[in-house]
Amino acid sequence: MESYSYGSVSDLEQAVSESLSGTVGAEDLPDIFSSYADTAYAVQREDKLTDLTQYFSDEELSKYVDSYIQEGYFTQDDSLYLLPVAKSTEIMMINKTDWDKFASATGSSLDELATIEGVVSVAEKYYNWTDAQTPDVTNDGKAFYGRDAMANYFVIGMKQMGREIFEVKDSKVTFNIDKDLIKRLWDNYYVPYVKGYFAAYGKFRSDDVKTGDIIAYTGSTSSTFYFPDKVETDDMSYPIGYVVLDAPVMAGGEDYKVQQGAGMAVTKSDKEHEYASCEFLKWFTEKENNLKFICDSGYLPVLKEANNIDELDKIIEEGSIEVNDKAYECIKKVMNEFDSTMFYTTKNFDNGYDARNVLNYNMSDAADAARKEVAAASDDESRKAVIEKCTSDEAFDEWYDGFSSALQEAVGEQ
């Protein structure tokens, strides 16, 4: 077997798309490739993927976490096209060192961070508290929070409020974008971002924790590997501790958690190559092998029996494996809550990748543009006026109309 790295999964997906479209210089599809469901679905629509049920028995497939394996069934004929190999969900990570200073001064509690609305309230308090540290300089408060993967904010936020933002039937999507519910998402991300309570500067929010620009974020469980051990700014550096919390939910909503992570697809070829590819996937997802991979990656195992902290501890002890402390604590937390967790991910549909990108960038780009407008204000009165304008009902209506149009344009005629 030969393996090839294309950098990130996104880079690999680009290479797969180029292979499908026959781009000049593109390589043939590999026997096995890592893929998110959106891309694998597009490849399957071109009839290029192997139905894995030809090589996996019902008994073998029953060992995988139900919601994970269901993600790979793209059609109504019980054909399986994507096998889960590692998954993740979202958690909240906090710079404990700076949180403790703030909490001691203001009486704030980690319990307040259980809901998105609570995060917004704490973030406002944090901004005002840090602003007060420099009484001779106005409006220099610091942001408290950020989040990775804005699409997850929409998808899981709407699900927690009782709606599927992408409702799919027969590969066709209906957008459930109830204006009042979307307004709640706007009020709890866009508005605090514009006011400076939230922020996003680096590629990932763990980068922003490292530079001291925020002290808390919602991100993938695998991001714990990258949570910094210290804050480094232009004029200081100091060590920090950490806290791992459940990702906040919409107040009053159901406690659904994001299910995410790439799977493995097998390209249609001949029986020999397809069989060998599936045997490799069986080996890779065996409990012991999968748990060893989890130790190195921070992802979650895909077999039911492997999602057990005792099984992980056994593998670590027997193999004398060194595991990142933050990643271990995060995985332990998720595993201990696994049986009671409701995971959720969207179903696949044509142009789903493009629609998801609208969720990823539409609101966050608008918030970033408005925040820059606020920062450019020349005085306090101008600043207040800009914030009022950018966060008004009229501003929301204008954004909402553009957001709705962008989603429709992303999927085209269905």
How should these model regions be labeled?
Residues 1-38, 207:
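Early extracytoplasmic/lumenal segment of secretory-pathway proteins
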Residues 10, 31-91, 135-137, 239-248:
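Hinge/lid segment of periplasmic solute-binding proteins
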Residues 31-34, 215-220:
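Paired acidic/hydrophobic, glycine-rich loop segments that form the ligand-binding mouth/hinge
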Residues 54-65, 108-112, 138, 144, ...:
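Short, solvent-exposed loop/beta-turn-alpha elements that line the ligand-binding surface or hinge
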Residues 74-85, 90, 117-174, 214-216:
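Extracytoplasmic/periplasmic solute-binding protein
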Residues 120-127, 168-202, 242-247:
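Glycine-centered hinge/linker elements that transmit conformational signals in sensory
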Residues 194-195, 233-307:
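Extracytoplasmic/periplasmic substrate-recognition and gating elements
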Residues 321-414:
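Conserved C-terminal helix/tail region of periplasmic/extracytoplasmic solute-binding proteins
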